[in-house]
Structures are given as C-alpha cells and as structure tokens.
Amino acid sequence: MSRYRGPRLKKIRRLGALPGLTRKTPKSGSNQKKKFHSGKKEQYRIRLQEKQKLRFHYGLTERQLLRYVHIAGKAKRSTGQVLLQLLEMRLDNILFRLGMASTIPGARQLVNHRHILVNGRIVDIPSFRCKPRDIITTKDNQRSKRLVQNYIASSDPGKLPKHLTVDTLQYKGLVKKILDRKWVGLKINELLVVEYYSRQT
C-alpha cells in the first residue's frame, strides 16, 4: 500500500488531529456519523482507527509500519513504546518536531532534496534513525536556510519536546536523548496498534 497523497482534511475528519500530516484541525462536530457495531466489529474498528492514525501522522506505507512493528516486537521492553520511539526518532519526524518544517511530508522533502545534514554529513533518507547527540543542520547555503527559516522562526518553543534542543539562529537542532512516552507528538493508544497487528498473524 502506497503512502497517502489524497485530501488531508478528509483524514482528520475521520481520525482526528494529525499534526504530522497537516496543521489543520477538524472542526468540532465535523466527524462523520458513527456507525455502531456490536462486540468484535466495534473493537476491530477502534484498533484499525488507531493504526491508521499512526500511519497517516508519520506518513508511512503499510509495509513500513508493519516493519517497525516487527522490529519493536523483538525488543525486551514494551512493544508499543519502542514502536513510538522508533517512529519519533526518524529524521523526517525530528525535523518536524524541531520546527524546521510545518509537516512531516514537508520535512521529508527537505531530506530527499539533500538540504539536511546529520553530524556534518548530508543524509537523504527520511527514515534515517537519529540517536542521542546527533546534530541536525541545514546545508550552509542560502537556499537551504531559506526553506526552513520561516518555519523555525515561527515555531512555538513551548511545544519543543524535552529530548530536543534547537538553535533558531544557526538552523541547528540537537537530539539530547531518546524521548519519553509523554513527549510523543500524537494522541494515540499504541497498545491497540500492536494488538491490531498481533491479530493479523
């Protein structure tokens, strides 16, 4: 299944706020009428909805998300929390959380077009996994800096998660540590996502 490129408002009306996909938020009461199902069908619908929220927020294909679930499942810690940490430490998401892009798709374009350096080296893979002490910067040219300056200047410092720091004058971000669960940028029940996939096997 390919990455979603359709109307973004359609998705947030159905799933709720997806800040990684769009800055827009659903209007109160704009959700579609809920169809009430009984028992197993309703439980399945809720699990599916949480899975879709995760997928569209981080801009993943179904195959990519499934791969992350498998990797998280091999860890000794909580599968759900490891899954969120893996997704949050992707380079495209780190750029978004630093305020260098307005959305994750926007951050992905910066990476794909080779505007971003990690520890002084160009990285053009959006899924690149960042780690503590990584330094993220733009290339030292006017075009690269211009692409992020408006976003980074208008970003809200209060929304910057505690595992990151940003220097808005030098267009530079630092990953201080692996994030805590409470700093995940999406309202999500990750256990339902893990449950969804465990029932597919």
From Swiss-Prot:
It is found in: Plastid, Chloroplast. Transmembrane segments: none annotated. InterPro entries: Ribosomal_uS4, Ribosomal_uS4_bac-type, Ribosomal_uS4_CS, Ribosomal_uS4_N, S4_RNA-bd, S4_RNA-bd_sf. Pfam families: Ribosomal_S4 (PF00163), S4 (PF01479). GO terms for cellular component: chloroplast; small ribosomal subunit. The keyword Cell division does not apply. Residues 15-43 are annotated as: Disordered. Residues 89-150 form the S4 RNA-binding domain. Gene3D superfamilies: Ribosomal Protein S4 Delta 41, Chain A, domain 1 (1.10.1050.10), RNA-binding S4 domain (3.10.290.10). GO terms for biological process: ribosomal small subunit biogenesis; translation. NCBIfam families: PRK05327.1 (NF003717), rpsD_bact (TIGR01017). Belongs to the universal ribosomal protein uS4 family. Part of the 30S ribosomal subunit. Contacts protein S5. The interaction surface between S4 and S5 is involved in control of translational fidelity. This is Small ribosomal subunit protein uS4c. It comes from Sorghum bicolor.
